[in-house]
Amino acid sequence: MKNLKSIIIFIAFGIIILVSYVIFSSFFEPRVYNLMVKNFVASQKGSDGIVLVVIDDKSIERHRWPWSRDLYAKIFDYMGHYTNAKLIGFDAVVTTPDENNPKADQELFDTIKDLDNFVGGFNPLRAMYPDQKEGAEYDAKFKAKFEIPIENNIQIKEPARFNSLSHYPKGYFKSLPNAGSVWVLTHPIDGFIKDIPQLVYYKGDFYPSLGLRMYAKLNNAKKIKVTKTHLIISGDDDLKIQTHRRWGGVFNFLHFYKNYKNSDYTHKTYSAVDIIDSMEAIRAGKKPKIDPKAFDNKIVFVGANAKASGLGLEDALPTPIQSKHPGVDIQATNLDNLIHNQTVRSISSTQELIVDIILVIAAFVVVANYSLIAGLGIMVLMVLGYIFLSVLSYKLNFAVPVITPIALQLVTMIFGYSRKFIVESRNKEKIKDAMGKYISQDIMENVVNDIDNVKLGGKKANVTVLFADIRGFTSMSEKLQPDEISVILNEYFTAIEPIISKHNGVINKFIGDAVMAIFGEPIQDPDHAVNAIRCANDMLKKVKELQVKWLEEGKPKIEIGVGINTGEAFVGNIGSEKRLEYTVIGDTVNLASRLESYNKIYKTQFLISSSTYEFVRGIADVIKISEVKIRGKEKKMNIYEVLRLTE
């Protein structure tokens, strides 16, 4: 049964830990990740070598939307033929020809066809091609022109996520020199962009992102290799980045940058209309508004984000650093990461499990060896230490789980201390039940409730001590068998114990056939003398009831004598460091014992001292029996027999 309980407890703990892990890792960890990236990763602005040209609200105010494609042609003509820009990335997808202005379309196509450093965007789509045969032909042409040879060392077992690709107009398809995916995917829990798909899986092949395509061109990549955990790019400079599989692609975590002051962007930005004006000025033989040299050796991203236009041109998504992060800046961030090898790495699931197990075991060790207060102190230190290491890790571009391990530790400690409290409470009850058969329940309560302060020593206190003894016990024991004597004594003691407790008395010890009880300590009672008298009176009544019962059972008749004294005595723990006894000692105790023995001499049953009489004279009829000499005192003390109680 004990083993079964242990197994059930272990299973219950495992379920609690598992549920806690799922809740915290799924719902809370992604949000903590955002905070860590914002505060400890995004500490610097994006590279000066990457700039953005944005179709912003200013551009839409000047040129009515939708734009004629000759406006795009002017931007790319300026960048491609009048600057020394390294690369031009177009964060947009051209899917339909301009039926109203085919001349403008042709101007765009003619502009980009000889720009080998131009990379256009495309999207993988869930929708099916209207005509599957034409779609298959388009896919084949797209693959032949834009696919990068990739060595794939992983098996793709997931179902197809995409069914088609952005369908370029024929002229644009023919003119476009390079293409990369601009598809991004938000996190399923909080809807933030945390990672980016470097490779999109489409119908058995991998296609690169816009940033990866641009990096491959910039770095003269000769081979791209995909493994289970990494993407390896071999070129002028070899690059190896940590990746993970997610919905429809191979992703890596982005290292976000710090925003420019009063800007939504982390890279330097130009308005598209200023570039158009500059191109028109150059064609007119005038000085351009923006000097083309500003873009020398720069990588340029062109995209739209006109949030105030009301035309649906706001291209912004939530990221850890801001609620509306322009999409073109996210694409630029990706390339910036690749160029500077700044992608955020993370620990594997196995490593995370090891960390969690270590911290849970550490929590168990604390629970097993320390009290709740000490354990909480150690827990605080462990949490602060882990947070410090987590912050340091993020500063080094390495993401680790933060809230989940801490939560698992906390859950372990709550479970452990709760279990410990329950077990200790049960053990205390068992100890109290067992030891209560040997010592007073009240003394046991004092010990159990203040276990840490049990030590040698005590105090002086005013108490009343009661001794009760069976008359003629020695001669009776010679006539009865030991088991018969045991039955009588146990029945007698069992009968008087609740009477003593009822009157706030504490049985200090059984001495053969005698019992010694204390009133006033450890139970505080200002009326301890009165209660002792009432207790003795009830004990004598109970013995008379027992006499009738024993007589019917053929057992011998027994009488008891009671002696009570009130005075100052030493109360506390007596003995050695390893074995203590809670008791009361002093002349007050000795006189109470002598009074009980005087009953034999004076043929009485109930004697009290004069000091006790002073407290009970109003509730008892007494007669003076004698005067006795008290050790250490010159005057003799009167002793009284209690005849009856008047109250």
Regions found by a protein language model. Give the residues of each.
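Non-transmembrane functional regions of envelope-associated proteins
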Residues: K2-H244, F295-Y370
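Transmembrane alpha-helical segments that form the functional core of multipass membrane systems
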Residues: I347-R419
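Regulatory cytosolic signal-relay segments
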Residues: T404-K460
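Catalytic NTP-binding/metal-coordinating core of nucleotidyl cyclase/transferase enzymes
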Residues: N453-C535, Y582
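Alpha-helical scaffold within the catalytic cores of cyclic-nucleotide enzymes
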Residues: N490-G505, E521-V562, T566, D587-Y598, ...
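Catalytic strand-loop-helix junctions within cyclic-nucleotide turnover domains
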Residues: I518-H528, V562-L580, N599-T604, T646
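Cytosolic regulatory/linker segments at or just downstream of nucleotide-handling modules
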Residues: A569, Y598-E647
